[in-house]
Amino acid sequence: MIEDRGLRIADRKKQSARVADAVMSTEDFRRRTFQFGIRVIRLTESLLKMDAARVIGKQLLRCATAVGANYRAAARARSRADFIAKMGIVEEECDETLYWLEMLIELRLINADRSKELRTEGNEILAIVVASIRTARRNAKGAVRYTDRA
């Protein structure tokens, strides 16, 4: 798993560029992140009743459901800075979700083929979030502030 990390990072960059081109409404993305959480809940329900699987499953459950919950909060942000900060949390939670999925696969507690769609969805959500943060930061730098006007 660790040897191919450089390749996965390169794949994420390519994926991020593709995903940034796609236009998705706030409501569509809210639904997508919600469904991602639902799919992870279903996956964790099927984990064996071993201690390690249960502990990792709970971690996975927390961070995967936090993706949608925190995106919902970001969509209601009061300022661009607030949006960027909340989207940063979404990014962290999504990345942590992918980490726990990799851990479960490496420990052979879940089948890599069975979780492939879920990992793909997680990577796509992560790419969208990263692209959104970059766009918001770029727009924040170019924004004209009312106090700057003469």
Residues covered by each model-derived region:
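Short, C-terminally biased terminal segments at protein or domain edges
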Residues: 1-150
